From Swiss-Prot:
MF terms (GO), sorted A to Z: FAD binding; oxidoreductase activity; polyketide synthase activity
Protein name: FAD-linked oxidoreductase ZEB1
Keyword RNA-binding appears in the UniProt entry: no
Gene from which this protein is expressed: ZEB1
Keywords: FAD, Flavoprotein, Glycoprotein, Oxidoreductase, Signal
Phenotype upon gene inactivation: Results in the loss of zearalenone production but still produces beta-zearalenonol.
Residues carrying covalently attached carbohydrate according to the record: N46, N82, N100, N340, N352, N421
Keyword Phosphoprotein found: no
EC number from the UniProt entry: 1.-.-.-
Organism per entry: Gibberella zeae (strain ATCC MYA-4620 / CBS 123657 / FGSC 9075 / NRRL 31084 / PH-1) (Wheat head blight fungus)
UniProt function note: FAD-linked oxidoreductase; part of the gene cluster that mediates the biosynthesis of zearalenone (ZEA), a nonsteroid estrogen that is a contaminant of cereal grains and causes estrogenic disorders in humans and animals. The ZEA backbone is synthesized from a single acetyl-CoA molecule and eight malonyl-CoA molecules. The reducing polyketide synthase ZEA2 is proposed to synthesize a reduced hexaketide intermediate by using different combinations of its reductive domains during each round of condensation.
Induction cue: Expression is positively regulated by the zearalenone biosynthesis specific transcription factor ZEB2. Conditions for carbon-, nitrogen-, or phosphorus-starvations lead to very low expression. Increase in pH results in gradual reduction of the gene expression.
SUPFAM superfamilies linked: FAD-binding/transporter-associated domain-like
Pfam families xref list: BBE, FAD_binding_4
PROSITE patterns: FAD_PCMH
Length: 565
């Protein structure tokens, strides 16, 4: 990754008009408006970013006339739920609602391929100056700016109609450093904004280290993942990703490159540690703690109604709920998936523990299942390194096996005190078609409201729950919207009713979450809004359901205008 000095390039300011000419000062300039930049202006921008401006052609274009290519289209259909084809694109998004069926491989060939909610252009940023030029151009022309790395995004924050995208995917620098200050002394790693989980896993392994990253290896580390919190299979051992952040390099709405840490710009440091991606600036790099590598053991366990009565199945779920807190407190992180017919631990992760220790940790759960006559399968595996454990249970690396684009979501942080009494609610929502993915961990010891801006409920949470209903590309759009309506209006209220005062993880939640300010950030929201007003008083940076996003509204065609507050 090349880092240039913090300055606007003369070629940009010398060739682009600073006159904002749009139909309304209350709306961003939109394609087709008189104020939309001319071809010459886009060409000048391209020159200023060394030819890295990309005019969006949707990924699904080969499935539609006049660009139809049958073999390419068939390949796209087969790969559409693989993250790899999307994160290699400057515009494609993985969440199907925000792709809006405007140009996907599953619509009829004769249906026109339209930009829809995709960005109009993107800059494949390779330098700090590329990002600064993108910001300057968007400000000068009063157009929407979107920040994007991989397209892993449930809430529509990395795309937008009529927008210029800053594509950080090529900022791939990884530099290991020694860190020494009054809060941490030890190994650290500086990650460019485009670095993905599988890349840092490999780099850390080569040095005998581990770095907190997501359970999906293709997710970027420094972007929305960490800025929103970032849970990990290592979270019970080291906290959320954001608890491990030591410093950021950030470009502000004014185009200034800042170092942001506990000593320099501490208010912005706090806001970036949980306030959500795309809101306070463009992160260029992030420096995080790197921890010693060691043995890591894992386990998977499953049972279902195929070999158990419904009564025995739900008795097994209750046993799990009763023993989960002790398993986590013994030093494990437990990913579990529950439907109304199946239960799966996938996996339990125990950093710095042997297989024998994992068996001891799980013994009360196993013994209770046996006493309840639940038929189950269990496997254990001790690995020499965390990388090997990850590859075994969350791989195969580098890209893993998590599919994308086939679900829509809701989310909730489930307090410790609630979990043992939660089985009936689980039964109700899974009987409504929900797949429940639980991330059981304890991040309480690693941060406070003073150090991070994630919802304070994280620190007393036992399970972050991600609830999903299916998305079927072959079904009518209105059928899928009905399922999202079910999530927003029926399913999530049931879960919220038994978790009063808690919240949701901002990165994995319902994109239509009511009262999102409180649900995503709790009492931190007021302070986050003050930081937003200080560093971005014009609210140049915007993401849906983000801090300060109330000031903007998005019309049905994607046009972004000031809200009538």
């Amino acid at each position: 990754m090349k880092l240039s000095p913090s300055k606007y390039l003369p070629v940009l300011l010398g060739t682009l008009s600073l006159t904002i000419a749009n139909p309304s000062a209350d709306c961003k300039c939109f394609p087709g408006d008189d104020c939309w930049p001319s071809a010459a202006e886009w060409k000048a921008l391209n020159t200023s970013v060394s030819g890295n401006l990309i005019k969006t052609v949707p990924l699904g274009a080969p499935c539609h006339d006049p660009m139809f290519k049958g073999d390419v289209c068939q390949s796209l259909r087969q790969q559409w739920q693989n993250a790899t084809i999307h994160f290699a694109s400057s515009s494609s998004v993985m969440a199907p609602f925000f792709a809006n069926q405007s140009c996907d491989p599953f619509q009829p060939r004769i249906r026109p391929c339209e930009l829809g909610n995709y960005v109009s252009y993107a800059i494949a940023a390779e330098t700090t100056s590329d990002v600064q030029n993108a910001i300057a151009f968007a400000r000068a022309n009063h157009i929407r700016l979107v920040i994007r790395n991989t397209g892993h995004d449930y809430l529509g924050r990395s795309t937008g109609a009529g927008a210029l995208g800053v594509w950080t995917h090529h900022l791939k620098n990884i530099e290991f450093v020694d860190w020494d200050d009054d809060t941490y002394t030890g190994n650290a790693v500086k990650l460019g904004a485009g670095v993905q989980g599988f890349e840092v896993l490999e780099a850390a392994r080569s040095r005998g280290l581990v770095v907190v990253g997501g359970e999906c290896p293709t997710v970027g580390i420094a972007g929305g993942y960490s800025q929103g919190g970032g849970h990990s299979a290592l979270s019970t051992s080291f906290g959320l990703s954001v608890d491990n952040v030591l410093s950021w390099e950030v470009i502000t709405a004014k185009g200034e490159l800042l170092t942001v840490n506990k000593d320099e710009n501490p208010d912005l440091f706090w806001a970036l540690r949980g306030g959500g991606g795309g809101t306070f600036g463009v992160v260029i790099s992030m420096t995080v703690k790197a921890h010693p590598g060691t043995i890591t053991s894992g386990a998977s366990l499953s049972f279902s109604t195929d070999t158990n009565s419904e009564e025995a199945f739900w008795a097994g779920i209750q046993v799990f709920q009763d023993t989960l807190e002790d398993m986590v407190d013994a030093g494990t992180m437990v990913i579990h998936i529950i439907t109304n017919t199946s239960f799966l631990i996938a996996p339990l992760t125990a950093y710095n523990k042997t297989e024998a220790q994992v068996k001891v940790i799980m013994k009360p759960f196993i013994s209770s299942l046996t006493s309840k006559h639940v038929d189950f399968d269990v496997t254990y595996k001790e690995s020499k390194t965390y990388y090997d454990h990850y590859n075994e249970f969350l791989g195969p690396l580098p890209y893993g096996k998590i599919r994308v684009g086939f679900e829509q979501y809701g989310g909730r942080l489930i307090p410790r005190s609630v979990v043992p009494n939660f089985t009936e609610t689980l039964r109700q929502v899974t009987n409504m078609g929900v797949t429940w993915v639980g991330v059981a961990t304890d991040v309480g010891p690693f941060g406070t409201r003073a150090t991070t801006s994630v919802h304070p409920a994280w620190r007393s949470t036992l399970v972050h729950a991600l609830l999903s209903t299916p998305w079927d590309f072959t079904k009518p759009w209105h059928d899928m919207i009905k399922l999202q309506d079910l999530m927003t209006n029926v399913i999530m209220p049931k879960v919220e009713a038994v978790t009063p005062g808690s919240g949701a993880y901002v990165n994995e939640a319902d994109f239509r979450q009511p009262n999102y300010q409180d649900v995503f950030w709790g009492d931190n929201y007021k302070d986050l809004l003050e930081v937003k007003e200080k560093w971005d008083p014009e609210h140049f940076f915007f993401v849906p359901k983000g801090v300060g996003s109330e000031i903007w509204s998005i019309a049905e065609d994607g046009r972004m205008c000031k809200s009538a507050l």
